[in-house]
A protein has these predicted regions:
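Structured C-terminal cap/extension of enzyme domains
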Residues: 266, 273-332
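Alpha-amylase-like alpha-glycosidases and glucanotransferases acting on alpha-linked glucans and related
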Residues: 11-264, 270-271, 276, 286-287, ...
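Short, well-structured secondary-structure segments
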Residues: 5, 266-267
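Conserved, well-ordered alpha-helix/loop/beta-strand core segments that scaffold catalytic motifs
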Residues: 1-11
Length: 334
């Protein structure tokens, strides 16, 4: 299997070539976004047009199938950004804010079957990014078709406590974060909270509440790492006395996720170098340099720099310790 892992973006830009070439496939007068939640109290306006579901179906979903096929062509795995799009999208009427939108359903089973068919044809693993507000129906359908779910350390909880590795599902990709969330080092110092405050997507009251909650979560995470016997003997038990992410914490968190039974385990490129700033800050446009942060090194340089070699060695060590191995993953089932 080709080891490259690609991403299928959520939609086409309203000024993009797809919209100009296939105008009947898009709805004008509305934009897509997401409703208010804890991360974006005002909701999010992604400023792209929703699909014309009637026209897509009448055309046999050709445009959708071609976009999947082309993205799969040079890789062995495909991540579907916001996989809930196959089930419903949050439409915002023109001249209204994200608070005034509503969900509009799509023909999910048709779309998932097209996705599964292309997965088998191209022998590509499918990962559905199912974070945020997700109905039970979505995860049940993904599991039925063999599409991996997305399980992040930050969100996997049993009540307020972090879920132990053994309770993670098999049919999933696991990681600490995504491009939309805090890096590991940024999470530990609360840089993501400060970024939202600087961008004015949260006020000072929300900022203080989130800082208090983060302090509690850091202690819960540290407790979970100790409970999993991943921290070295004599290591500090009080998270308030650990001002920044240490090498020991990074190693233990990586081992925590490597120990899960989940099919895939992913380390984000920002974590080996302890980058503080995430790639994208949801709910912002000009307020944050979204997608403007370059990698510290080129792909060619990665093979020789110490940080990447150390990360590769750590991953090999955890693979050996956990018996995770590199077994093949089957494509989505029809």
């Amino acid at each position: 299997m080709d080891q490259r892992y690609h991403d299928l973006a959520l939609a086409t830009d309203r000024c993009g070539s797809d919209l100009w070439a296939f105008r009947p496939f898009f709805i004008t007068g509305c934009r897509v976004g997401s409703p208010p939640d804890g991360f974006s109290p005002n909701g999010q306006d992604w400023s792209f047009p929703p699909p014309n579901t009637v026209h897509h179906r009448a055309d046999g979903y050709r445009l959708f199938a071609e976009s999947i096929r082309k993205t799969m062509r040079h890789g062995g795995a495909l991540r579907i950004d916001h996989v809930m799009r196959l089930f419903r999208l949050y439409w915002i009427p023109e001249e209204h804010s994200a608070k005034d939108g509503a969900y509009v359903r799509d023909r999910a089973e048709d779309l998932v079957r097209v996705l599964a068919l292309e997965s088998v044809r191209n022998q590509s693993v499918i990962v559905g990014e199912d974070l945020g507000t997700v109905e039970d129906e979505v995860r049940e359908t993904l599991a039925h078709f063999g599409i991996l779910s997305y399980k992040l350390l930050y969100f996997e909880r049993d009540g307020p406590k972090f879920r132990p590795p053994a309770k993670y599902p098999v049919s999933a990709l696991t990681s600490t974060s995504t491009h939309d969330l805090a890096t590991m080092a940024g999470y530990w110092i609360g840089e993501d909270i400060e970024a939202r405050f600087r961008a004015r997507t949260i006020d000072d009251g929300v900022r203080l509440a989130q800082q208090k909650e983060r302090a509690q979560d850091k202690q819960r995470l540290l407790d979970a790492l100790f409970a999993a016997e991943l921290m070295p003997p004599g290591y500090e038990h009080d998270a308030t006395r650990i001002p920044e992410l240490t090498g020991e914490l990074h190693y233990a968190i990586s081992g925590f996720l490597a120990s899960t039974p989940s099919t895939m385990w992913l380390i984000n490129q920002e974590d080996p170098t302890k980058e503080l700033h995430q790639q994208n800050l949801p709910g912002t446009t000009a307020e944050y340099p979204n997608w403007g942060r370059k990698m510290r090194w080129t792909i060619a340089e990665l093979a020789s720099v110490k940080e990447s070699r150390d990360c590769a060695a750590m991953m090999r060590l955890w693979i050996e310790k956990t018996g995770r191995g590199c077994s093949a993953v089957t494509a989505a089932a029809l």
